[in-house]
C-alpha cells in the first residue's frame, strides 16, 4: 500500500509534511470530498471488509467509498504512515427514535495528538453530520464549522458529540415532509471514550451491521459526498444536495427522485463511483437523515 496512491486518490498534492493542524485539516477535507461515505456493497451482493489491504484496493484503486469502519480505518493508516500520533477510538451512535445511544460500539473514529493537544478526526459519518475540520478534544466548547456548530462534552470519562444545526429550506414542496430531513436543531451524534481500539474490536459488529434485518445499513442503500459548499446524498433512489448557509443561517436542501438509469449515471458523475455489480436501491423504514 502506497501513501502516494492515497494522496493521488484524495487529490492531495502538498509536500509540506509539517504534521501540524493545518495539514491534518487538509487531509481530512481532501478525503471527505473525494471518498464517499457509502454502503453500496451490501446492496450489490458484496461484503463490507475490514482488512486494510481490501479497503485500500476498494477505495484507492477502484475509487469507491465505504462506511466508517473502512474509511476511518484508511484515514488512521494514512495519518500514522505520515507520522501523526493517531489512535483508533470506538463510538456509540445516537438513535433518535429510541432516544438513546447504541448498545454496540458501531462507529470508528480517530484521535490525533499534536504538540500535546488532542483532536478528534472523523471522515466517516457523512451527510450533514460530517465534520469538516478536526475537533479540539475540549469539553463544553462550541466549535463552529461550515456544516454546523459542533460541541464535545465530557462526563465521567465518556465524551459526547453534539451538533447545533441551521434552519433548512426545501424548495420542492413534494419533499418538505420527507423522512430524510432532520427535524431537530440540536442533534446528538455519538458518544465515545478515549480507550484505544484496534480494528479487531469491530469485527463482530461489522458482520452484524451488514447482515441483520434490524440494521440501518441493510435497510437503506446510501452514498454521501461532501463538496466545497455542501453535501450530496443518494438514499435509495432519492438524490439530495444540501448547500450550507445559502442564506443567513439557512441551509438549502434540494431533492430529486431518480430512475434506475439515472442512479447509475449520478453515481458516476456526482460521486465518482462505478459499480462492478448491479445495485438494488433500497429505502427501508430504518431512521436515516441527511
Swiss-Prot record:
Example of a GO MF term: N-acetyltransferase activity
This protein's superkingdom? Answer: Eukaryota
Query: Outcome of residue 266 to I?
Result: In allele NAT2*21; slow acetylator
Q: Which UniProt keywords apply?
A: Acyltransferase, Cytoplasm, Transferase
- Subcellular location as annotated: Cytoplasm
Residues that, per the record, bind substrate: 106-107
The protein's matches in InterPro entries, at most eight in alphabetical order, are given as: Arylamine_N-AcTrfase, Arylamine_NAT_domain_sf, Papain-like_cys_pep_sf
Its predominant location is: cytoplasm
Q: What's the effect of swapping residue 121 to I?
A: In allele NAT2*21; slow acetylator
Q: Which Gene3D superfamilies match?
A: 3.30.2140.20
* UniProt keyword Glycosyltransferase, yes or no: no
Q: What is its EC number?
A: 2.3.1.5, 2.3.1.118
Enzyme class comes to transferase
A Gene Ontology cellular component where this protein is annotated is: cytoplasm
Q: Which Pfam families match?
A: Acetyltransf_2 (PF00797)
Q: Which reaction does it catalyse?
A: an arylamine + acetyl-CoA = an N-acetylarylamine + CoA; an N-hydroxyarylamine + acetyl-CoA = an N-acetoxyarylamine + CoA
One example of a Gene Ontology biological process annotation? response to hypoxia
Where is CoA annotated to bind? 103-104, 208
Residues at the active site: 68, 107, 122
What task does this protein carry out?
Catalyzes the N- or O-acetylation of various arylamine and heterocyclic amine substrates. Participates in the detoxification of a plethora of hydrazine and arylamine drugs.
Similarity section: Belongs to the arylamine N-acetyltransferase family.
Q: What is this protein called?
A: Arylamine N-acetyltransferase 2
Amino acid at each position: 500500500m502506497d501513501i502516494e496512491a492515497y494522496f493521488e486518490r484524495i487529490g492531495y498534492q502538498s509536500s509540506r509534511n509539517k504534521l501540524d493542524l493545518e495539514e491534518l485539516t487538509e487531509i481530512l477535507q481532501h478525503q471527505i470530498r473525494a471518498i464517499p461515505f457509502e454502503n453500496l456493497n451490501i446492496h450489490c451482493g458484496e461484503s463490507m471488509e475490514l482488512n486494510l489491504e481490501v479497503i485500500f484496493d476498494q477505495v484507492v484503486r477502484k475509487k469507491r467509498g465505504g462506511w466508517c469502519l473502512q474509511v476511518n480505518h484508511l484515514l488512521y493508516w494514512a495519518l500514522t504512515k505520515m507520522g501523526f500520533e493517531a489512535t483508533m477510538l470506538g463510538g456509540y451512535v445516537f438513535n433518535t427514535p429510541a432516544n438513546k445511544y447504541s448498545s454496540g460500539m458501531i462507529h470508528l473514529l480517530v484521535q490525533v495528538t499534536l504538540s500535546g493537544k488532542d483532536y478528534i478526526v472523523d471522515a466517516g459519518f457523512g451527510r450533514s453530520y460530517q465534520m469538516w475540520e478536526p475537533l479540539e478534544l475540549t469539553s463544553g466548547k462550541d466549535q463552529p464549522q461550515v456544516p454546523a456548530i459542533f460541541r464535545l462534552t465530557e462526563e465521567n470519562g465518556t465524551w459526547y458529540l453534539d451538533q447545533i444545526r441551521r434552519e433548512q429550506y426545501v424548495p420542492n414542496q413534494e419533499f418538505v415532509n420527507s423522512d430524510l430531513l432532520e427535524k431537530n436543531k440540536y442533534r446528538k451524534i455519538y458518544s465515545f471514550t478515549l480507550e484505544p481500539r484496534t480494528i479487531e474490536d469491530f469485527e463482530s459488529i461489522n458482520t452484524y451491521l451488514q447482515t441483520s434485518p434490524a440494521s440501518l445499513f441493510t435497510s437503506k442503500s446510501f452514498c454521501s459526498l461532501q463538496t466545497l459548499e455542501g453535501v450530496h446524498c443518494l438514499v435509495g433512489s432519492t438524490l439530495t444536495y444540501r448547500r450550507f448557509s445559502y442564506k443567513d443561517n439557512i441551509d438549502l436542501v434540494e431533492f430529486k427522485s431518480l430512475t434506475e438509469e439515472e442512479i447509475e449515471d449520478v453515481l458516476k458523475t456526482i460521486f465518482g463511483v462505478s459499480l462492478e455489480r448491479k445495485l438494488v436501491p433500497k429505502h427501508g423504514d430504518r431512521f436515516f437523515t441527511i
